[in-house]
């Protein structure tokens, strides 16, 4: 989707594309504090999504410290723009893209669901709906932690990169979720971001998943019958019907 070797994605299409109408596309952005993991760790989500008749894509991006988070945001936006332009070629509906991500992937998904403050119109990369799992929406608390050794954020850049302080006017319908056993900071940031979205008139649902923590909550997203899975597929139906 872009000029770098890291600018790749996996796009997996359901069998019903052969004769059917264009289907929704579910896009996942992996976590790893912007410095670890890859799209390979996301592919387990695809099976249930394909079984439901939807297309699935997992995005790769460059990692810190080779690049700054600003570039990662640009790369993910580029990937979304590419996916939105390629729907007619692959048989999915470019107007029915659901973007989801976990942890740092939720941060990146949020950044791909808003326009920068100077922009007056909706951007080409913004999806139809967003699902944010255990996300990070204010980055300044990370500055004085070991996580920032690779990120190299300043206070100013952390503020610029925080969805909590962004223009949310064009943000799509959103599900924000976190685990019962998350840290208080993850819970607080999720709730604060949801409040900001609702304050701007965005349709938002929140969900605390019982018994789940920062690392295993994503398994509930892959489970159609789990608490989060039910809300996830209900959102897809609501947005895409």
What residue spans do the PLM features occupy?
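A fold-wide structural signal in alpha/beta-hydrolase
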Residues: 25, 50-62
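N-terminal cap/lid segment of alpha/beta-hydrolase-fold proteins
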Residues: 1-20
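Residue-level signal for short, function-critical loop segments
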Residues: 15, 32, 180-182
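Primarily recognizes the serine-hydrolase "nucleophile elbow" in alpha/beta-hydrolase
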Residues: 78-145, 159
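The feature captures the conserved acid-bearing segment of alpha/beta-hydrolase catalytic domains
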Residues: 123-124, 129-143, 155-192
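C-terminal catalytic histidine-bearing segment of alpha/beta-hydrolase fold enzymes
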Residues: 177, 187, 191-194, 198-241
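Catalytic nucleophile-loop/oxyanion-hole region of alpha/beta-hydrolase
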Residues: 37-45, 57-96, 222-223
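Short beta-strand element of the alpha/beta-hydrolase
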Residues: 21-32
């Amino acid at each position: 989707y872009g000029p770098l070797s890291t600018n790749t994605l996996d796009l997996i299409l359901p069998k019903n594309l052969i004769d059917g109408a264009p289907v929704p596309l579910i896009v996942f952005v992996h976590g790893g504090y912007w410095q670890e993991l890859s799209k390979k760790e996301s592919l387990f989500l695809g099976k249930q999504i394909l079984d439901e008749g939807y297309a699935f894509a997992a995005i790769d991006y460059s990692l810190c410290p080779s690049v700054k988070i600003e570039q990662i945001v640009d790369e993910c936006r580029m990937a979304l723009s590419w996916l939105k332009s390629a729907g007619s070629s692959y048989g999915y509906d470019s107007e029915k893209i659901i973007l989801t991500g976990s942890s740092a992937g939720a941060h990146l998904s949020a950044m791909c669901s808003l326009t920068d403050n100077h922009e007056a119109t909706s951007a080409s990369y913004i999806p139809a709906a967003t699902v944010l799992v255990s996300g990070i929406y204010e980055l300044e608390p990370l500055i004085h932690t070991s996580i920032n050794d690779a990120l190299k954020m300043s206070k100013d850049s952390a503020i610029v990169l925080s969805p909590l302080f962004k223009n949310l006017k064009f943000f799509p319908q959103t599900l924000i979720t976190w685990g019962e056993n998350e840290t208080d900071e993850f819970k607080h940031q999720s709730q604060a971001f949801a409040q900001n979205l609702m304050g701007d008139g965005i349709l938002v649902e929140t969900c605390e998943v019982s018994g789940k923590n920062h690392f295993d909550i994503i398994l509930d997203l892959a489970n159609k019958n789990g608490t989060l899975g039910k809300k996830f597929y209900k959102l897809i139906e609501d947005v895409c019907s």
